[in-house]
Amino acid sequence: MQKLELLYEGKAKRIYRTEAADMVWVEYKDSATAFNGEKKATITGKGRLNNEITTLLFRKLQEVGIKTHFVEKLSDTEQLVKKVSIIPLEVVTRNVIAGSLSKRLGMEEGTALTTPIVEFYYKDDDLGDPLVTEDHIRLLNVATPEQVSVLRDAALQINQVMIEHFASCRVRLVDFKLEFGVTEEGEIILADEISPDTCRLWDETSNEKFDKDVFRRDLGNLTEAYEEILKRLGGASHV
């Protein structure tokens, strides 16, 4: 498989065409952003860590029958994935009150939820990726009610697998963001990535943060935090 021309460059990844019409080549970048791109930095090794962690987690999900776009890891920072049309919704599942939910509802960060909360955010940088209801989604015409139901059910299924998997590594899955895409056959599958960029991950005992909040809040060394997650997941740490 060959990497051909650049199709798209986002905040954290570059997407390239391949000679296969149904595959694209993903390259993870060493860039870190927060607050919708207002805070930026280049952090050596971050692309490798996100690629390694995403590979491990997507393989875990595939083992239990959850369909993803992941095909294979190509290098430390690259992977081959199925080409999909991304649904412009971020699907956020929350198990613990943190971040914007804490601010929005005035509830204490760290409070465990009795049942997970699923939220949808409209993917639009100019609008700041606003929180939307199912009625808003219908108005925007970005997904059908049936597709929204599929996204919610998939997010909750993935959440249960991930909670158990991270718990086995002594990590608390606080919340995480998923993106989904539609294949040429019309099937909705998990896309994008699952990494400390897209999850809040706390040590189960100390609540030490091992995610992008380390960068957002200037809490320490981001690569060391991500390396700790990779190590706990059984990956090859480069520390």
UniProtKB/Swiss-Prot annotation:
Gene Ontology molecular-function annotations:
ATP binding; phosphoribosylaminoimidazolesuccinocarboxamide synthase activity
Q: A single GO BP annotation from the record?
A: cobalamin biosynthetic process
* Enzyme Commission identifier(s): 6.3.2.6
Keywords attached to this entry: ATP-binding, Ligase, Nucleotide-binding, Purine biosynthesis
Record flagged with keyword ATP-binding: yes
According to its UniProt record, in which pathway does this protein act?
Purine metabolism; IMP biosynthesis via de novo pathway; 5-amino-1-(5-phospho-D-ribosyl)imidazole-4-carboxamide from 5-amino-1-(5-phospho-D-ribosyl)imidazole-4-carboxylate: step 1/2
Question: What InterPro entries does its record include?
Answer: SAICAR_synt/ADE2_N (IPR028923), SAICAR_synt_PurC (IPR033934), SAICAR_synth (IPR001636), SAICAR_synthetase (IPR050089), SAICAR_synthetase_CS (IPR018236)
Entries under Pfam families matching the protein:
SAICAR_synt
Per its record, the protein catalyses: 5-amino-1-(5-phospho-D-ribosyl)imidazole-4-carboxylate + L-aspartate + ATP = (2S)-2-[5-amino-1-(5-phospho-beta-D-ribosyl)imidazole-4-carboxamido]succinate + ADP + phosphate + 2 H(+)
The top EC class is ligase
Tell me the HAMAP family matching this sequence: SAICAR_synth
NCBIfam families xref list: purC (TIGR00081)
Q: Which family does it belong to?
A: Belongs to the SAICAR synthetase family.
Query: What is the name listed in the Swiss-Prot or TrEMBL entry for this protein?
Result: Phosphoribosylaminoimidazole-succinocarboxamide synthase
